[in-house]
Amino acid sequence: PITFTPYLGIRSSRQMAPEEYAKKIINNEIVAVIEGQAEFGPRALGNRSLLCLPTDANIKKLNIIKDRDKDSWRPYAPICQKEEADKWFHITKACPYMLHIAKIKSGPFNTYDNSARLQIIDRNSNTFLWSVLDMLRQSGHSILINTSLNSKGKPIVNTVDDFKEIQIHDGLCY
């Protein structure tokens, strides 16, 4: 059978173990992920992403890093494990690739219209990201905020060398 995958881009070797990413995220750091094959399409799915906990302080930091207006109509996208999704969102369709909108039930973040372009991860769809989320869940955090790893007006980063060339890497871990 033919299997769909959005991971068609350049492959990158692991920069840090999932445990290291999880520790940094739990410490309220924003991490840059360059992991596995790059995503194809108009969104970042965790392999070329900036990830953080959904706190007001982190959202403010992301707005500065991404050079966004604080009242941007484009909210950041949440990622959670399949096992946690029903707790936080009204799910009507599978959301492995951020192609559907889910209404927010409750949670540590809000959007202007109570909707989110959600990505739901299961153990088989993205083992790396599922592992990071699993470690976060054990620390009481079950949602990550995700945005593409690029600077304003630029394409998504493909390689570590690309990342080093853009201006958003100051103070970020990868």
Where are these regions (language model features)?
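Flexible beta->alpha loop and helix N-cap segments adjacent to enzyme active/binding sites
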Residues: 1-174
